[in-house]
């Protein structure tokens, strides 16, 4: 979302670092989700119906976290330690093999 208006927008210069060292410090580091587990705040969790799965791996491709992995038999599985419950996997699944169910506490 662009939050600059008027003169500030006209005079703004794009930030295009030439190397990784030129990027400004950020409060989030790369790979942070591999260190921090989801916790108990998730309200919905994906459940996979292997009878509907066609092993297209679209869910794996679109998952924004390292939460979906491919098992030895070729089916996908969910690592609930990393799953945030966003539902992108269920939304993108072409065969609706993934459904979001309310997390039981």
Curated annotation (Swiss-Prot):
**Bound cofactor: record note:** Binds 2 [4Fe-4S] clusters.
Indicate yes or no for the key word Transport: yes
List residues binding [4Fe-4S] cluster 2: 63, 83, 86, 89
Concerning SUPFAM superfamilies, the annotation shows: 4Fe-4S ferredoxins
UniProt xrefs under PROSITE patterns: 4FE4S_FER_1, 4FE4S_FER_2
Kindly state which reaction or reactions the protein catalyses: 3-methyl-2-oxobutanoate + 2 oxidized [2Fe-2S]-[ferredoxin] + CoA = 2-methylpropanoyl-CoA + 2 reduced [2Fe-2S]-[ferredoxin] + CO2 + H(+)
Required cofactors, per record? Answer: [4Fe-4S] cluster
Q: What is its EC number?
A: 1.2.7.7
Q: Which InterPro entries match?
A: 4Fe4S_Fe-S-bd, 4Fe4S_Fe_S_CS, PorD_KorD
Q: At which positions is [4Fe-4S] cluster 1 bound?
A: 53, 56, 59, 93
Query: What GO annotations for molecular function exist for this entry?
Result: 3-methyl-2-oxobutanoate dehydrogenase (ferredoxin) activity; 4 iron, 4 sulfur cluster binding; metal ion binding
Domain 4Fe-4S ferredoxin-type, first and last residues per copy: 44-73, 74-103
What's in the keyword line of the UniProt record?
Answer: 4Fe-4S, Electron transport, Iron, Iron-sulfur, Metal-binding, Oxidoreductase, Repeat, Transport
Enzyme kind, highest EC tier: oxidoreductase
Q: Which PANTHER family would you find in this protein's record?
A: PYRUVATE SYNTHASE SUBUNIT PORD
Q: How does it assemble?
A: Heterotetramer of one alpha, one beta, one delta and one gamma chain.
* The name this protein goes by in its record: Ketoisovalerate oxidoreductase subunit VorD
Organism of origin = Pyrococcus horikoshii (strain ATCC 700860 / DSM 12428 / JCM 9974 / NBRC 100139 / OT-3)
């Amino acid at each position: 979302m662009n939050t600059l208006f008027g003169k500030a927008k006209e005079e703004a210069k794009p930030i295009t670092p030439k190397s990784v060292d030129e990027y400004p410090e950020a409060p989030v580091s790369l790979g942070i989700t591999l260190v921090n587990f989801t916790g108990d705040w998730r309200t919905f969790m994906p459940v996979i119906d292997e009878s509907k799965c066609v092993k297209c791996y679209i869910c794996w491709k679109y998952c924004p976290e390292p939460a979906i992995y491919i098992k030895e038999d070729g089916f996908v599985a969910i690592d609930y330690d990393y799953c945030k419950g966003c539902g992108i996997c269920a939304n993108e699944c072409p065969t609706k093999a993934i459904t979001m169910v309310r997390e039981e506490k």
